[in-house]
Amino acid sequence: MQNAWSKNTVQLLDTTSRPYTGEVLVPFSLDEAYARLCAKDPAMPSLVHLWRHERAMVLGSRDAKLPHAVEAIRELQMRGYETAVRQSGGAAVPLAPGVVNLSLVMPARAVDLNPEPFFVQMVELIRAALGTDGERMHSGEVAGAYCPGSYDLAIDGLKFCGIAQRRLTRAVAVQAFVNVEGSGREYGEQVSSFYRVAAQGTTVHNYPQVQPERMASLAELGVSGGVSGFAARIREGLNAHKESAIAVMDSCPPWLEAEAGNALDALKVRNLLVGS
């Protein structure tokens, strides 16, 4: 299996100092474009991508198929949310200035069909970034949390991070949301409100039964440093892998931006199918 740190260079794109305010698909298109480049060229260095958005709700594909998904999305948009359906798995996740999105994009051999090692790399990167607080962190599905999954990350039983994965034939993008600041309960209430509208009329509970009190932010869990501190600790965690040089970027390079434009068009087409 390809290890993210086995390359001579790791690209770090960190735009957390300037949260996105427009289309939330834009940062996802950067991940998608880089993954496509990795699929074509196994010599591409791994990319670690950190970003934030001012106000958005990112949905999973199953969310988009709920009976009143279109109505729920329109309601969110009227309240000032950017909305999108992402390529990776998972379910609805709210984005805000206190939420850091962390992606790990790398080449992967076509025979590496087991997704777990890639999830583990993300888990260990976050654990290292939390320092001694990482010793308190546990992975495993948190009942009642939004966007539930086998690699939920929690401290004291409260989820602060969820991880999803997007697979291409020869590349992988592991994407995490990390509630660094803000109220986990409020984030949970936003998701619960979406499902109350989107799931009207369904008798099958094929969507997360969200209990907002099962969510928290790192700040609420006693982890200091805020967004800037978390981003800095991710960089420190990368630097701990002495065999890799870190190429740091605080804005998208032109060569990637051009590729991302094509990926964005494809993602927009997918999003036109919401509710169908």
Identify the function of each model-found stretch:
Residues M1-L113:
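N-terminal lobe of the biotin/lipoate ligase/transferase fold
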Residues V26, H68, N114-M122, G226-F230:
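Short amphipathic alpha-helical segments
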Residues A64, P107-R109, L158, G182-R185:
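Short loop segments at secondary-structure junctions
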Residues V99-A143:
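Contiguous, small/hydrophobic- and glycine-enriched helical/loop subdomains that border
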Residues D133-E135, R170-S276:
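Long, positively charged amphipathic alpha-helical accessory segments at protein N-termini or as interdomain linkers
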Residues S139-K159:
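Beta-rich nucleic-acid/ligand-interaction surfaces
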Residues G157-Q165, A173:
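Aromatic/basic-lined ligand-recognition segments
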